[in-house]
């Protein structure tokens, strides 16, 4: 039997599939400029030393095809939000975020972490047993939460699990479409054993995606409603692509992902 669960800081428990998301408890850190979070600082990356990680982790943490699928899917979702977004920024791959995701995935701990990085990052998690044909099988459940989301911010989309697992969850989705979150880095790891709320799953595929700057600020909308690209930050120079503020980079994937 194939099982799959998605997680963020709250949980929604069902028999075969789990989708939930990270909700940050306060927005006091917003006083720090969002640009500080765009690229993870080298000293933070150094605190997760690859040499100290399990030997299996030294393999490539995610394939280039998976990178492309994840980024393209996020941008597809972000460009088609409704109501339309005036300030949606185009999302690109960040290798530093991916390396941090790799280190956490290698721990095979079914929870968000490491805790000292979560004030800098947003994070979505997904786990499943059995084979899969596409990495999007682990990502699409996050988007599926859109059916339970009502703009501008979640109402009853934050059940408390595993003790009180009921009601819809939608904060995976809101992290995916948070307008100012413009970088993503993910890693996938096969865990020989992973404890998922008391049940030991064997040979489970564990996906960790880190986002920067982080989103999901309580009481705030994920984006500003308006004509697409009508409220882009000045740094984008008026460039717009697929209803998103587009950065001044080449569209060569090899350049983005090297």
From Swiss-Prot:
Gene3D superfamilies: CAP. CDD domains: CAP_PI15 (cd18814). Residues 1-21 form the signal peptide. This is Peptidase inhibitor 15. Glycans are attached at residues 36, 124. Serine protease inhibitor which displays weak inhibitory activity against trypsin. May be involved in facial patterning during embryonic development. It is found in: Secreted. SMART domains: SCP (SM00198). Belongs to the CRISP family. SUPFAM superfamilies: PR-1-like. Residues 22-60 form a propeptide. Disulfide bonds: none annotated. It holds the Pfam family CAP. Residues 71-211 form the SCP domain. Its main location: secreted. One of its GO terms (cellular component) is extracellular space. Keywords: Developmental protein, Glycoprotein, Protease inhibitor, Secreted, Signal. GO terms for molecular function: peptidase inhibitor activity.
């Amino acid at each position: 039997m194939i099982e799959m669960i998605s997680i963020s800081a709250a949980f929604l428990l069902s028999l075969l599939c789990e989708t939930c998301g990270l909700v940050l408890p306060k927005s006091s850190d917003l006083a720090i400029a969002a640009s500080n979070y765009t690229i993870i600082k080298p000293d933070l990356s150094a605190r997760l030393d690859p040499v100290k990680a399990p030997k299996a982790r030294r393999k490539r943490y995610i394939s280039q095809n998976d990178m492309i699928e994840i980024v393209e899917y996020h941008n597809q979702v972000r460009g088609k939000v409704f109501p339309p977004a005036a300030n949606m920024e185009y999302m690109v791959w960040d290798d530093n975020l991916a390396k941090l995701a790799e280190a956490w995935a290698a721990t095979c701990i079914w929870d968000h972490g490491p805790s000292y990085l979560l004030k800098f990052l947003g994070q979505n998690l997904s786990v499943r047993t059995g084979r899969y044909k596409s990495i999007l099988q682990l990502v699409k459940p996050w988007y599926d939460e859109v059916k339970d989301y009502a703009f501008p911010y979640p109402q009853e989309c934050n059940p408390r699990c595993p003790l009180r697992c009921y009601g819809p969850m939608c904060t995976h989705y809101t992290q995916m479409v948070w307008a100012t979150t413009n970088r993503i880095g993910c890693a996938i790891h096969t865990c020989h054993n992973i404890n998922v709320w008391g049940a030991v799953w064997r040979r489970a595929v564990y996906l960790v995606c880190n986002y920067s700057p982080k989103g999901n600020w309580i009481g705030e909308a994920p984006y500003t409603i308006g004509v697409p690209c009508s409220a882009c930050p000045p740094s984008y120079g008026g460039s717009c692509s697929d209803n998103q503020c587009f950065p001044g980079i080449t569209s060569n994937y090899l350049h983005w992902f090297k």
